[in-house]
């Protein structure tokens, strides 16, 4: 402490605590937005892999299907009236 008195020392300590809290919160918010952006990019690549030329680079992508679902049974029979 700077030796300016008890009140000044308490205010200086409170200022340092506030600064650490603000820095920690900004770091946490930054990491949250970073992971949110990465997750959104991953979802978009998986959902729309055939757009933008990045579909073949995805792990587990099939060149025959390339992101399109093929029905394996007749869906019309479920909804026919």
Swiss-Prot record:
Q: Which domain of life is it from?
A: Bacteria
Q: Which InterPro entries match?
A: Bchl_c-bd, Bchl_C-bd_sf
Gene Ontology BP terms: photosynthesis
What does UniProt give as GO cellular component? chlorosome envelope
Coiled-coil ranges per UniProt: none
Q: What protein name applies here?
A: Bacteriochlorophyll c-binding protein
Give the similarity note: Belongs to the BChl C/E-binding protein family.
In which compartments does the protein localize? Chlorosome, Chlorosome envelope
**Gene from which the chain derives:** csmA
- Give binding positions for a bacteriochlorophyll c: 25
């Amino acid at each position: 402490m700077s030796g300016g008195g008890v009140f000044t020392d308490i205010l200086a300590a409170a200022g340092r605590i506030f600064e650490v809290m603000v820095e920690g919160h900004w770091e946490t918010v930054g990491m949250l937005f970073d992971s949110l952006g990465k997750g959104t990019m991953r979802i978009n690549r998986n959902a729309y892999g055939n757009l933008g030329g990045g579909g073949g680079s995805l792990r587990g992508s099939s060149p025959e299907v390339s992101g399109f679902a093929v029905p394996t049974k007749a869906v019309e029979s479920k909804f026919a009236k």
